[in-house]
């Protein structure tokens, strides 16, 4: 047995499923999850001493690569001053200043501890601001595990919320409407059915939790227009895309201005951090200056602020996003070419430092149903073949891949060469 096998066996006796977040259990691909000992740059090293080119990046935060010296040194320096104060710090002010400079749609920002906290709080704020209860989310989009967002989408353009997790009462999600990603007609149908009741739309500008599905050109501007028409707020969930698709986020890349933005992952540089922010008149509804309550014992934690500031300062350097996009483009082109040579039908979606691999005969993948029509079993086989080659992809056909600027041209070529060998075995 490997050390990962031994540790997983022990973990399953102590931790539900042996993991602290379900996707880590490899249920989407089968087998034993890797237990990681350390990481550096573009590489993970498991407890058995094997190295892997990493395209998970801790599920997005590691845009600079693992164990970046600037972040590590900032954390050490901050920790020497104390771990948590429960009081304001200068670092919080500096972080707020930097974030609002980088994301112009955010006049004010509130720090929290996770992406889930950010989206949950943003929705509460939107409801408090508009005095409306219903929200629109999209089939296949994930915004954290808050009760009102754990909704199963059925067939058809519009689904009145039904929870897809035991423990979530139907009453908690009855105000959640689910529409089809990249389908504006389904959104208009929802607004026309409830013209005075919808508080907000919450959307991933690039859907990253049904693998990687970019928006069609008209989709995000269309959502903005519908929100304006019906008096709802537009919440763009940039937990995954923020500072990765572009320096100012996917909202700048696609030229759409939200009322509220949610951030996470990269903003913490690997530490647990989230944030949400928006226009003055919306954010001023938050306690302690407004009636909408939100709080957190560890919000604005000084260690997390130090890590996030160091990360954002590095990400803001000239050429970072150009290089990130170049690496991702080269990987996508190489995978596509290798699959074609092996007569394996493949679609590779990519934008900025995100990508998604789909085994499908379809020409495009633009929504959840397209993703569900892909060959999931072939992906499982491909995942394990690539793992044997020393390439670590997301262990699920429904999760995006992430590039870092620590990846080299040699890493990309090694990955493409490995994929070519794996495609040949898939025939």
Swiss-Prot record:
Q: Which Pfam families match?
A: Aminotran_3 (PF00202)
Residues in a coiled coil are: none
Which residues carry the post-translational modification N6-(pyridoxal phosphate)lysine, per the record?
A: 265
Enzyme group, top EC level?
A: isomerase
GO annotation, cellular component aspect: cytoplasm
Q: Does the keyword NAD apply?
A: no
Keyword annotations from UniProtKB, A to Z: Cytoplasm, Isomerase, Porphyrin biosynthesis, Pyridoxal phosphate
Keyword Isomerase attributed: yes
What pathway does the annotation place this protein in?
A: Porphyrin-containing compound metabolism; protoporphyrin-IX biosynthesis; 5-aminolevulinate from L-glutamyl-tRNA(Glu): step 2/2
Q: Which GO terms describe its biological process?
A: protoporphyrinogen IX biosynthetic process
Give the catalytic activity: (S)-4-amino-5-oxopentanoate = 5-aminolevulinate
* E.C. number(s) listed in UniProt: 5.4.3.8
* Subcellular localization, as worded in the UniProt entry: Cytoplasm
- Could you cite one Gene Ontology molecular function of this protein? transaminase activity
Tell me which family the UniProt entry assigns to this protein. Answer: Belongs to the class-III pyridoxal-phosphate-dependent aminotransferase family. HemL subfamily.
Subunit-structure text: Homodimer.
The identity of this protein, by name, is Glutamate-1-semialdehyde 2,1-aminomutase
Its source organism is Photorhabdus laumondii subsp. laumondii (strain DSM 15139 / CIP 105565 / TT01)
The gene for this chain is hemL
